UniProtKB/Swiss-Prot annotation:
Family: Belongs to the class I-like SAM-binding methyltransferase superfamily. TrmB family.
Annotated InterPro entries: SAM-dependent_MTases_sf, Trm8_euk, tRNA_(Gua-N-7)_MeTrfase_Trmb
EC code(s) of this entry: 2.1.1.33
Gene: trm8
The keyword Secreted belongs to this UniProt entry's keyword annotation: no
Pathway(s) annotated for this protein in UniProt: tRNA modification; N(7)-methylguanine-tRNA biosynthesis
Origin species: Neosartorya fischeri (strain ATCC 1020 / DSM 3700 / CBS 544.65 / FGSC A1164 / JCM 1740 / NRRL 181 / WB 181) (Aspergillus fischerianus)
Keywords recorded for this protein, A-Z: Methyltransferase, Nucleus, RNA-binding, S-adenosyl-L-methionine, Transferase, tRNA processing, tRNA-binding
Residues at the catalytic site: 232
Transmembrane segments: none
Task of the protein: Catalyzes the formation of N(7)-methylguanine at position 46 (m7G46) in tRNA.
Catalytic activity field: guanosine(46) in tRNA + S-adenosyl-L-methionine = N(7)-methylguanosine(46) in tRNA + S-adenosyl-L-homocysteine
Name recorded for this polypeptide: tRNA (guanine-N(7)-)-methyltransferase
Length: 360
């Protein structure tokens, strides 16, 4: 049997060693806990959402086991289990990043929303493995920092040490405030030196095909925020059916999003931005593409009319005050690449309206 190429062997060995180091209570020095490197997690840019991937998904949201993803939020009462027999959490997942990629948005939102459970959904295997390993390493680093901080606090006895402790606490508080700001460094080679709110215990990632199984994970009105950042534009007309924004999927997002919840979108493709606006009923007068039939256009118009009753676009004034928008622009890997290339970023955020009343 022919062995795999040397590069593949090197990648597999690195990924295995990195995953083991991140998941085990290893070195005492924070600097020794390394974050994974992207070059060892090669993955194609696309995955066909219509293929029958080997995926694990719950029968319903009540069957989903979140305990392994958020161990710090597991209900201490072992008798509190869901329909699948898994331990329940103290709170529900309420923020979702659809197509989380390499996890830049998750890392940026973690200290900004320390009391909210955030999950990223990704269909590509290697990318998900990278994100999972990255989160485990960040949690391990925070654990070591907490232990080092506690030891330093206990060791301070003399007045000079107490004064140094006070100064150190003030410095840590300022650093933590900086860490909680939305402009975060997501360089995988960076080793944090301060504690961040939440210690990255509130983020995780799962492998899932959102186009098929989104309602299997989230109950009605469970979510407060949905992020769709730099989705695959699928430029060819015959590929438009694979876009993550459509009438059908928008209805599923509205089902899981609670009234007042926000759906964030950002793209660097202007045509796709207008597609998003049309499918949320904002650009109702836009002409459909020439190759589409009139019957399909009429059906889309009717669907958009229904979406218009469920979503309203958030004004630019509100977006300027929303810290999540800043993170979405600056913390994601695609956002950084667009900034390096001096490209444009098109943002549209939609608020979930209250469900319309049934006619009498």
């Amino acid at each position: 049997m022919t062995p795999p190429p040397p590069k593949r062997q090197k990648r597999d060995e690195y990924r295995k060693a990195t995953a083991e180091a991140a998941s085990q209570p290893g070195p005492s020095d924070v600097a020794e806990i390394k974050l994974p490197k992207k070059k060892y997690y090669r993955q194609r840019a696309h995955a066909n959402p219509f293929s029958d991937h080997h995926l694990n998904y719950p029968l319903s949201p009540a069957h989903m086991d979140w305990s392994s993803h958020y161990p710090a939020f597991v209900d201490p009462d072992p008798s509190h289990t869901n329909l699948a027999g898994a331990r329940k959490l103290l709170k529900d997942v309420e923020v979702v990043d659809i197509g989380c990629g390499f996890g830049g948005l998750l890392i940026g939102l973690a200290p900004l929303l320390p009391e909210s459970l955030i999950v990223g959904m990704e269909i590509r295997v290697s990318v998900l493995e990278y994100v999972t390993t990255r989160i485990q390493a960040l949690r391990a680093q925070q654990l070591k920092l907490r232990a080092a901080t506690a030891a330093a606090t206990a060791a301070s006895e003399t007045p000079s040490q107490q004064q140094a402790q006070i100064d150190g606490k003030q410095a840590n508080a300022n650093a933590a405030a900086d860490a909680a700001s939305p402009v975060l460094s997501t360089d995988t080679e960076h080793t944090p030196t301060t504690l961040v709110p939440g210690s990255y215990e509130n983020i995780s990632a799962i492998r899932s095909n959102t186009m098929k199984f989104f309602p299997n994970f989230f109950a009605r009105h469970q979510l407060s925020k949905i992020f769709i950042c730099f989705p695959d534009p699928h430029f060819k007309a015959r590929k438009h059916k694979a876009r993550i924004i459509s009438e059908t999927l928008n209805a599923e997002y509205a089902y899981a999003l609670r009234p007042g919840g926000l759906l964030y979108t950002i793209t660097d493709v202007e045509e796709y931005h207008h597609w998003i606006l049309r499918h949320f009923g904002v650009e109702s007068g836009a002409e459909e593409e020439s190759e589409e039939k009139s019957t399909s256009a009429n059906a889309n118009a009717n669907a958009n009319a229904g979406v218009r009753e469920l979503f309203e676009r958030v004004s630019e004034e509100e977006l300027e005050k929303d810290e999540c928008v800043r993170v979405m622009k600056e913390a994601t890997e695609e956002g950084k690449k667009v900034a390096r290339n001096k490209g444009n970023k098109y943002v549209a955020v939609f608020r979930r309206k209250t469900d319309p009343e049934w006619p009498a």
